[in-house]
Amino acid sequence: MYIYLKTPLQNHSKYLPHLVEHCSGHSALDAVNFFEFSYGLDGVSTPEYTRFEYDKRVPYEKALEKLFTPLQKSAFLYETKILQEELGDPSYDQRIYEAVIRQYINPAISLNGIEKPSREEVEKYHAMRYRPENVIVTSEKFQVFYHGFKPQNTFDQVQLQIISDTFDFEDDAYFLLLYKNHSAKEYWELYFIFWMLCFCSTFVMRRQEGNYYFLEPYFHRFGEVCWCLFPRLDYQILTPQFFEHGKQYIFKMIAEGYFKEMFFLNEYFYGIPLTRIQVLDFYKNYTYTTFLAKLKAFL
């Protein structure tokens, strides 16, 4: 069972909602609650939502009651130390995601920085966001059990902006393809491109060149912006034949029900409401010529 809450950044920072997530799961540390609620000890905190996972045997009403309970002072003191330890060593994935956001969207945004909010600020954010009208509860297959808000409205249609660039991060070299003010179809187009580049980079780096460790593409989004990062390689393997086989595989994954969480998040949080059938129809008609045109700056 999954519980999702809308938890936007506070003053361009993820620190406060991230700390509240830690504090909300803190009650699972005592022996009375640990075994039943241990799934909820660690949530997943993103710039737009927080997700908690609980055993399906736990009634969601009971889990929500735990999350909505006012935070304890002991939780604030204990989890502040834990979060600072976590943020002291962010993963490569976390660092590169933040780096793109700060360079191409807003340099003021902080996703991995350490701050010192007061206990009152933490309690205020918790009271404002951890309430029934800000929650959606789903099964592990994303059947909605409870929803306190309706799906996200789609973005206002503004002219699409495309950025094609090189992106150097730490010791690694990438290409970047970024869509700003995208429509739902443009979002799914970039996701298709991402998968095709995943197949290509794996084929080249693992199968042809024999590398066990190698850079892989990323697909990310933030607000009205989505982007694909992919390693700076020779993509001559992207022949019409390779494209058609990759397209069939992507089509098969969508048709067989993969990416359930992605469809759910797109509908309720991101304003990208294409159904699975609509995505399949779009991919079915997506051509090699159109694909190459989007990547002409890199090939």
Residue ranges and their predicted role:
Residues 1-16, 142-203:
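His/Glu-based metal-binding/catalytic segments typifying zinc-dependent metallopeptidases
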Residues 16-24:
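Active-site His/Glu-centered metal-binding helix of metallohydrolases
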Residues 23-158, 205-299:
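Charge-rich, well-structured scaffold segments of protease-associated domains
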